[in-house]
Amino acid sequence: PPRSTLFPYTTLFRSMIKLARRLGVSSLHVTFPTEAEWKRLGKHGLLLRTGQQFHWHNRGYESFDDFLADLNSRKRKAIRKERAAVAKHGLHIRALSGADITEAHWDAFYRFYRGTSDKKWGASYLNREFFSLLGERMGESVVLIIAEDGDRPVAGALNLAGRDTLFGRNWGSEADYKFLHFEACYYQAIDYAIAHRLEWVEAGAQGPHKVQRGYLPRLTYSAHWIADPGLKSAVERFIASERREIDYQMKMILARSPFRRDQC
């Protein structure tokens, strides 16, 4: 890039490190930069780390069936079977945004969120007011998938829509409906992305169950400045080892891609 475009980055990165030293903090961390920003951070002495998340890519699909057509027959049949099983529950599932999301919806989703977070992590870091403020200040970016049994909300998945990406955030359910998690979190997100011509759905980390549903591994990036030389050296060795393992995992996962070979 021209030197003029690099100047703001250089100034920002140097200022960040200078501030970290002045404050006497032990470390400084930059998470989820773009690949280009990540490489520039490395030139300023930060340790470069890669991670792995599972994302769905919209290849110009006009419908969910278009997406299914790119999968091998076994995975295609499995997804259709899962969606049919959810349909048999008789639930009403819809995607809500903006003014369509009421306080009653947020009350229900907060219950779902608490049920999941308390069960998995033992504590909920978001309070009820947060969700009202989210709807008030970012309502048009919120995509709330709500599943209702009659008039009663029973499950929900919270997403945020960006310029070209739908970001999956939280999920919860008050009842056990087979395959509903996959429907609400993955298939409904794909439906929404296709309808709104979004290029990506980011479903986050942890992924063998996501891969067979069309979400493939994609590298994420972070950069780390560590004040103590000894600790920095140890972390650098760990990152190198971890990167080799991530590269290996990605190759193994992609070798078992659900997509037809002519689509990989």
What is each residue range found by the language model?
Residues 14-24, 184-199:
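Conserved acyl-CoA
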Residues 1, 5-12:
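Short, small-residue-biased leader/transition segments that mark boundaries at the very start
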Residues 212, 221-223:
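Short functional hotspots where side chains directly engage DNA or cofactors
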Residues 198-206, 211-212:
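A donor-sugar binding/catalytic signature common to diverse glycosyltransferases
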Residues 1, 174-183, 199:
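Alpha-helix N-cap/helix-initiation motif
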Residues 227, 231-264:
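In a subset of proteins, long, contiguous C-terminal domains/tails are tracked
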Residues 14-179, 224-225, 240, 257-264:
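A conserved beta-strand-loop-helix scaffold within acyl/acetyltransferase catalytic domains
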Residues 3, 141-145, 201:
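Short loop/turn microsegments at loop-to-beta-strand junctions
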